[in-house]
């Protein structure tokens, strides 16, 4: 029986069996002052547990409905225990003065960054679920990162109240909608990465921006043919994320096996780390800033906030691109073909900083490609979304969905777009639910269509030295529609998909964009 879940955002609800810990905005743990703790002899009032919102009902609506239903009977909480739903903790008390305002701004910014960092847990849970249920082919690497997952199951909380480790064995089952979306995302990107590595005889290199707990490097190294074609693989992410990833790599024999004997951790040779100790060397933060968490012959793990590469960043926080990606931190070669991966990254970055990053990464390498997976708030039903498949140019592909043109033609087509399209109804629901998790989408708002996201690469990479720029973009719905009947049937039967209309709407709001640039 089909559920009435129209306009449901995948982040809003989950399966009943895992709704308490997966896909929900991380709950903040209340810290009670020591003088307010109860004495062991005092009577303690026990309140009934809060009901779990039912599937298909946005959490904000579920919470408001439940609160209205119980407010008449339940006693009002003590003033010191009040929290404002959906607002940072700093807004629940009145503050005054410049110092308090500055503190509030800093706290809010930190909460927003923590929320973005925490999205890696969603992606990892989704891949684990798709692997467990047979959507994706089995591989042993992804599960090695699972113990770094946050959980809402009562585990200790870390900075800003976000739960810390999720232990193997916890429920990781996602809804069929999410599992199919994860399959389409992972299988499409995996196929494009493999195609890139197999092109020609040259070795290739890959830069994954916002890599999180991704296991792609290890999957490449497990393939004899692909591993010999890979020159170097670089992963960049927040320091908190790379620290967690380092811990898992050092504790996992399977993951450590792909690091050669000359590898180093924060500059310390891997061979110097005791095989009987799982301790991670401390990064002392010397005067010369060091970004390489792990440095191996074919792999570099870098701890950096890519937003700080922008020249408008305060000098104390600014990161030099040459210092980050130069020979001191990585084994990248600017003359080799390079693929840059942005998996659900650009949506969270202010458009001016993201465009600067795209442009300067493109200028750094002679032959560069980009593969971006992101949110399309306007969906693929908007007229400009279709234009990406049929933009006219001198060398337009005959197949709708692949636009190939020179730099000049790419720029001329981009000027025909009058203004950003507004989010669809479903896109607005997505924004509301993500904002409840302290997630802002400045990049997705600035580029709401697939066409706009495709053209941002053409604009960023167009200069007098460019020989050719090719761009294309497709929604996950388009990829789903083009699957063979046998494969779609297999995926639908795995869990008995009965939410046809909902999955179509969901897949229309996620896209994969490709761009390629070569110099003469």
From Swiss-Prot:
One of its GO terms (biological process) is methylation. It catalyses: [phosphatase 2A protein]-C-terminal L-leucine + S-adenosyl-L-methionine = [phosphatase 2A protein]-C-terminal L-leucine methyl ester + S-adenosyl-L-homocysteine. Pfam families: LCM. Residues 79-89 have a biased composition (Low complexity). The keyword S-adenosyl-L-methionine applies. Its EC number is 2.1.1.233. Keywords: Methyltransferase, S-adenosyl-L-methionine, Transferase. S-adenosyl-L-methionine binds at residues 185, 210, 237, 305-306, 343. Residues 1-116, 142-174 are annotated as: Disordered. PANTHER family: LEUCINE CARBOXYL METHYLTRANSFERASE, LEUCINE CARBOXYL METHYLTRANSFERASE 1. This is Leucine carboxyl methyltransferase 1. The lineage of its organism: Eukaryota, Fungi, Dikarya, Basidiomycota, Ustilaginomycotina.
